[in-house]
């Protein structure tokens, strides 16, 4: 049986989908509706408060890393197979390299930024 890296990307795809489905909607409600409409104090998302919360806790950094990085892999997997389905089968390998390479690059950049905070 030939070895494949497909299960790794499928697991990252599903994890990114779960994060996108469970956490991103509530984050959009909080930052896009509750705080602007005065359901929370205006300084809730002030720079000083957010910076101290992120820089003071490795758990917060880990959660932010998951919420930011995993949806990149969900996007990469979905975008690659969308392009393959519309007829770009001949460059399937190139699409995989570009899409997953972009997701890996974004994940590395996210890790570097969170590490230095």
Residue ranges and their predicted role:
Residues 1-117:
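Membrane-embedded alpha-helical bundles that constitute the cytochrome b-like, heme-associated redox core
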């Amino acid at each position: 049986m030939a070895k494949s890296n497909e299960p790794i990307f499928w697991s990252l795809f599903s994890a990114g989908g779960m994060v996108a489905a469970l956490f991103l909607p509530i984050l959009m409600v909080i930052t896009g509706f509750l705080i602007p409409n005065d359901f929370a104090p205006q300084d809730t998302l002030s720079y000083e408060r957010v910076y101290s919360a992120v820089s003071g806790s490795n758990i917060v950094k880990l959660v932010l890393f998951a919420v930011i990085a995993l949806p990149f892999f969900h996007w990469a997997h979905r975008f690659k197979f969308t392009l393959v389905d519309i007829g770009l089968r001949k460059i399937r390998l190139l699409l995989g390299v570009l899409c997953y390479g972009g997701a890996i690059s974004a994940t590395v950049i996210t890790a570097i930024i969170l590490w230095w905070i």
